[in-house]
Curated annotation (Swiss-Prot):
Enzyme class: hydrolase
Protein source organism: Verticillium alfalfae (strain VaMs.102 / ATCC MYA-4576 / FGSC 10136)
UniProt cross-references to SMART domains, sorted A to Z: SNc
Membrane topology: Single-pass membrane protein
Similarity field: Belongs to the LCL3 family.
Protein name: Probable endonuclease LCL3
Region annotation (Disordered) ranges: 1-40, 254-278
Gene Ontology annotations for the cellular component aspect, listed alphabetically: membrane; mitochondrion
Residue ranges of domain TNase-like in the record: 88-246
Top-rank taxon: Eukaryota
UniProt xrefs under InterPro entries: SNase_OB-fold_sf, Staphylococal_nuclease_OB-fold
Molecular function in Gene Ontology: endonuclease activity; metal ion binding
């Protein structure tokens, strides 16, 4: 007799349950957590791995090029690259003035921002500066020639040198490079601040009547200021300033002076060569 209070009146055991078949019921099979994460794209993964290497190489190259262009110090005219001319300028301190249109520059790339004058010391004294400066010639002007090799110089040569020294010696200047001349000097348009206004050094020499515009048929570097320079020269000439105060009959331009003295030197060399004493045996043969 079956138990009256059971869950079922039947004495048969319940049928065993079959395992759920997700495919039959139309459900997706269970997935692990890792399988749910997006799989990386192989090219993208390679790019991520090589990106730091690429950026490091590009950054190093950029830093090297920046150093070469802006922070490398040039110790002389011979070390300046040809691609700098007519494109770049150099900042530096004037260490000496040789005449009315030339001086020596100690290159200080980066200026005070690079520590020059407070972290990096500029050498002093001829021995410490030997081989460390750039010879600069002012573009577009020609100052009176000073005495050379025992020969007298031109009038106002000393005044021109003194004025240029007072104007730029031991001061910071910026030289806009044009070319390298036959004497390995850098021809440049030079500017300085006096005290806060930017001044063209060559132009100021012309205004004072202590230089003429450069006289040559070709190859003159003006820095785009030929008309400005010639106008300043004309004004100084009209006011009879400096060398323009010399009488017209006695005036000799720096170019004419150099041509004359160089011609005299050549004539003297020719005379000396023609009067060289003959060897004794030639004198004996020729009588």
């Amino acid at each position: 007799m079956p138990w009256p209070f059971g869950p079922s009146g039947s004495s048969e055991a319940p049928p065993p349950q079959k395992p759920r078949d997700d495919k039959v019921e139309g459900r997706e099979p269970a997935k692990s957590w890792n399988s749910l994460l997006p799989k990386p794209d192989p090219p993208l993964q390679a790019a991520k791995e090589w990106a730091p290497v690429f950026l490091t190489a590009v950054g190093s190259l950029a830093a090297f090029m920046f150093y070469q262009s802006y922070l490398r110090r040039f110790a002389g005219a011979a070390s300046i690259q040809e691609n700098f001319f007519r494109k770049r300028s150099l900042l530096g301190r004037v260490t000496s003035v040789g005449d009315g249109d030339g001086f020596h520059l100690y290159h200080t790339p980066g200026g005070k921002l690079a520590g020059w004058g407070w972290l990096r010391k500029i050498p002093e004294g001829r021995s410490n500066l030997k081989g460390e400066t750039i010879s600069i010639r002012l573009a577009g002007i020609d100052a009176p020639e000073g005495p050379h090799f025992g020969r007298p110089g031109q009038p106002f040569a000393a005044e021109a040198q003194a004025h240029l020294s007072k104007y730029i010696l031991h001061r910071r200047v910026r030289a806009h490079l044009h070319k390298r001349d036959q004497y390995n000097r850098i021809v440049a348009t030079v500017s300085t601040r006096q005290p806060f206004i930017k001044k063209d050094v060559g132009l100021e020499m012309l205004k004072q009547g202590l230089a003429t515009t450069y006289e040559a048929k070709s190859g003159v570097e003006w820095g785009g200021k030929e008309s400005i320079y010639k106008a300043a020269e004309a004004k100084a000439k009209a006011k009879k300033l400096g060398l323009w105060s010399i009488k017209a009959s006695e005036f000799e331009s720096p170019r004419d002076f150099k041509n004359r003295t160089q011609g005299n030197e050549k004539s003297e060399r020719d005379v000396e060569g023609s009067t060289v004493q003959k060897p004794w045996w030639r004198r004996w043969l020729t009588g």
